[in-house]
């Protein structure tokens, strides 16, 4: 209980002390970084994805139960990307970039269970995922990470769990 209170106070200090201008600057910086990394993949159809994201609240939307501040969704996506780069031990591949950054597209119009919506949105926007990328995004919450054999899915699940703070509650789920 004490650590939760300390975390809450620290979050208030860090996020509560930012002016609206500072928060807007952070959101804009995250948007620019997100788009720059996506464009660097050179994947056909990526401009269509960016165009569709510009017409939504993706860059300003909170991520849900975690990253609840303005711009939390894009912040979480960037964190998942950075974590995947750390745990993959290879040069970041196009698939790592795409699955990390695009795994929560389904939260754009819906805050609940979303993985199938992420894959659906990307397809509707004319963006083609590989089969492995689609499975990684679709299953990044399902069935528990210990069952993932494919590296891409496993690493996306682990990175998402780390970014959301899931590791902080693992003892409550009897997983340690």
Task: Give the label of every model feature segment.
Residues 4-12:
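Sec-dependent N-terminal signal peptides
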């Amino acid at each position: 209980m004490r650590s939760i209170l300390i975390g809450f106070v620290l979050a208030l200090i860090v996020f509560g002390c930012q002016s609206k201008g500072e928060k807007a600057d952070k959101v804009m910086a995250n948007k620019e970084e997100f788009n720059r990394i996506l464009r660097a993949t050179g994947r056909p159809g990526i401009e269509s994805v960016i165009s569709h994201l510009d017409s939504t609240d993706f860059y300003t939307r909170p991520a849900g139960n975690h990253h609840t501040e303005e711009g939390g969704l894009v912040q979480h996506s960037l964190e998942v990307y950075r974590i995947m780069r750390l745990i993959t031990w290879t040069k970041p591949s196009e698939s790592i970039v795409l699955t990390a950054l695009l795994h929560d597209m389904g939260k754009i119009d819906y805050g609940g269970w979303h993985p199938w919506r992420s894959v659906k949105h990307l397809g509707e926007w004319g963006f083609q995922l590989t089969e492995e990328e689609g499975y990684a995004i679709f299953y990044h919450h399902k069935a528990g990470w210990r069952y993932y054999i494919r590296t891409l899915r496993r690493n996306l699940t682990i990175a998402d769990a780390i970014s959301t703070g899931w590791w902080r509650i693992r003892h409550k789920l009897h997983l340690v």
